[in-house]
Every structure is written in C-alpha cells, then in structure tokens.
Amino acid sequence: SDLMICRYSYNYDEITQITPEPLYWESFNLAGDDLLKEIIQQIIIEGTVSNEQDRDCSGVIENHARQLGIPEVAKKLNGFFGKDSNNIGFKGKLMRINFINQIAIPIALRYMGHANKEGDLYLSFSDLFTTNPPGKELLDYFENHFGFRFEDIRWKLSPSKVNEITQSVFSKLVGQISGLVGLYNCDIVILSGKICSFQSLENLFLKYHPVTPNRLINLNNYWIGRWFPFADNNGYITDSKTVVAVGSLISYMGGTAHKLDRFKINNQHLCLKLVSTADYIGPVKQGVIQDVVLHAKNSDGTLIAHTLPFQIGFKNIDSIHYPSRNIYAIDFNDQKIIETLTRKGTTDASRLNDAVEAFKHKIRSRMPLKFTISREFDKDKELVVISEVTDNEQDDISKSYFELHTQTLPETTGYWLDSGEFTLNIRN
C-alpha cells in the first residue's frame, strides 16, 4: 500500500498550471494479498465457531471435519497447509499449491465480492465452481488426506465475517496513516485501489477521522466522467488499478509533451524530490527494526549474526513503532566458496557439494559473526556493502565468502502464494 502527501499550487493566466510538491511518501508491506491470505486461513482453513453467525464461514474445512468426527484434525490441517516438514513430500507441496490456486483463491474472491452486500448467501460446491472446477486428482487427493469429499462442504458468504477480518488486518495501518494525514493537515484524502472498494475499509478512515467525510474521496465509487478510458457507461471507474496508469499519462501529456489544451502539470518537484526512504537501516524481524545501524550521520555500522541468512530492513523514521520493510539478506556466497575449494584442489563434482557444506559448517562454528556494513548516504541510500567480517574471537573472515543480496520478502523460502504455506494455530 502506498501513501503520498502533496502540496498543490496553481497559476492561472490563460493556461492553468498545477504544481504538486511531495511532502511525504511511503510504501507499506500490507495490501490486498494479505487480506486474501487471512480470508483463506480464517474462513476456509481453520477457525472457531463462537456463535451462530460463524457457522459455515469460519474455519469451514476444520469444523466440517470435526462435525464428521474425523480424528486428528489439527494434524491433518498442518500436514496439508502447514509449514514444510519432512512429512510433506513433493506431491503434497504440489497439491497444496494447486489447492490454493484452484480452490482457495476462487472461494476467497467470492467472499470478497460479496462483502459490500446485505445478508448472507449460502452456496454449494457447484454454485462456487460453475466454470473452471478444480481437477479431479486434486479433489481425490483432498479426500484421501482428510477423509471426506470437499464437494460436500456448504459455504456461507458472510459480509460481516469478511468485514471483521478486513478491519482486523488494516486497522493499525489505517490508524497510522490517519495520524500522518492529520499531522500534515491534509485538506482532501483520496482512496484508490481495489482494496479500498470495501466499505468496511472506508469506514475505518471515517472512524479515525483524518478529514471530514465530504473530503474523503473513494475513487472506487466516484463519478469521474465518461472521458476516462476505463469508465462504465455511467462514468464510474470500472477498474481502480487503471487510475495510476491514466494519471501517469495525464502527467506526461500535461508535464512533458504539453499536449493538453490550456492545462499544464509542473512535475519538477516530483522528479527531484522523490527519493528513497531508506534513511534508517538495521536488522529487521517481523517488520520491526529495534536497533538502527546506518543513518544519515553514520555511514558505517556493525551487525551481529547468530544465523544465516540474516535479514536487513529499512524505514523512513527512527521510531520503533514505524513500519519497516525488508531490503537485504546476508548469506553465504556459494560461488566464491566453490572457487576457493577448487583452487585448493577439490574438483570432483560428486564431492564438491559436501565440501561446500563442510566449509559453511566451519564458519557457522565460529558464530556469532560481526559484519561491518557501510554506504554513502548522500550518493545512494540503498547501496550497502560488506566491508569487514570477524568471528566470535575477533579473527578476520574473508568477506568474499558472504553476499548481500536483495531480499524484500520477510520469508526467505518464498511468498505464500507460491508455496501455499500457512502458520496455523494448532488445536487438538
């Protein structure tokens, strides 16, 4: 999710010229995919039925299995959706990914599509998959694993359940954004993007009250006119993702090509002032940087790594409460280690992998390692290099054995949409 706060000025002398000046800009690692993940986990996979409203829309698979008296439900759920273990083979991982793509995501999108409507809607498997049904092999694998047919499950599309999850996912972020909007005394707030089409999310902004309701504009239901290339016959935007593309085109036509009649956009400030927000860099864990290592007045710093890979993040403001994002990871440089072993005479391909692992093991036995990293703040905030490495006895280790590579995802194993993994709440 992106936030931009601008000051706008304009001049009118036969030609109207608008000049946006960016005051604050930031991206946050929370968006529609995170909501999708929570809906899949809380509605489709696992959850408790605390009242009648939760029935058929909370942990549907788990509760359907419990109603049937299926033994070891938690074990079965973790064996299918949980983090990879030695018990999940290649086929299990493949079926898990297929389940997410063929079943979970389509069902979650149906729930999200019903979120702004009134009343619950009960659907069967055939109602959900009128087209593009999941493959028979996947459905058979599901039955073999859980002990019942997925097609027998009944689903209740509950707007209140989806809106409850939406507010729990975005409440903290909307509160922080509203605080920033209030700090800058913004006159108008514009919401865009598919995720803002949820009325519950718009209600969160109204709850935190960054501006008066009439100054909160949601482009998902804003009449823009039929001139917009992606508007419907009534002049409303059909796909909110097109707003950025069309806005960029208008900026180019009015600011560079000068092809808009008596209208210009002076984008000079946007070109000069929009720079990286990686002002503070340090070790990151669960989106939080406790100790800042590099900042504007400190071009060198040290990191203590007890394990590799080691995650490094950045943030715009030096506050423990300010959201941080991953940017780099320190890990072994396998290529350099192979080159070192080859020079020492290890050339047998069958032995090389074992030699590399043995080499890494020797380095790990000297942990914790102290990495000295540096950058030139004024030249490039994000260009960080490893300048020195020492072990737990202050002996030097060649820095060439390590690499600092881009790692913007918190999980080094990959994104959840690619792996299908979930961290489940284990219950007996």
Regions found by a protein language model. Name each.
Residues 19, 134-138, 146-162, 213-238:
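Surface-exposed intrinsically disordered loops and tails
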Residues 291-428:
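Long C-terminal appendages of very large multidomain proteins
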Residues 200-219:
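Short acidic, glycine/proline-enriched helix-loop-strand junctions
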